[in-house]
Amino acid sequence: MANIDAPFGLRPIGNTVGSSDFQMTEYLIPDNEATSIFQGDAVEIDDNNAGFIAVQEAVTNVDNIGVFNGCLIDSDPSTGKPKFSNFYSQTNITQGKIKAFVFDNPYQRFLIQGDSGTAAAAADIGKVADTVATHSGSTTTGISGLELDVSDLETTDGQLKAIAFTGDPQNNELAIHANYVVQFNEHAHKTQL
């Protein structure tokens, strides 16, 4: 059975310390930030704007801070009222802040779809790889297009570590677009796995 090519970014599913604690931390997005951030995108502390987050570029050695889940614009420029969204698109605010909610527990586990470059293999588990953005995030659903770069799986130097396959009978674990359980390998709050 072929897997469906329907990326969803990084979706939290639990953590390695035994609980299903899905706590988020509030960070800030700079006013008028031009880069969109979608639910499920990996984010980092912005080097150019201290104290703010930015979308994590795929294939990079910068430590992630976590995964974006949504944002609250204190005062939406078009309505003057607070607005929550599961994705961020360029907003020029006149007052208030743009607050981002981020899953930043370094021991959080996530689900992510593998890309179409290489079929999944049992030997993938325990290896690390970067993410790849072969699809854009959706402004309709707000969901990320981020995928795991399966052809990049190796023993060192990658954003994410493959922990397991999902065990979902609707997902062929040895085909392209397999769903992986992963954990951050490169994270600002811990050393590499």
Role assignments for model-derived ranges:
Residues M1-L193:
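Surface-exposed, low-hydrophobicity beta-strand/loop segments enriched in small/polar/acidic residues
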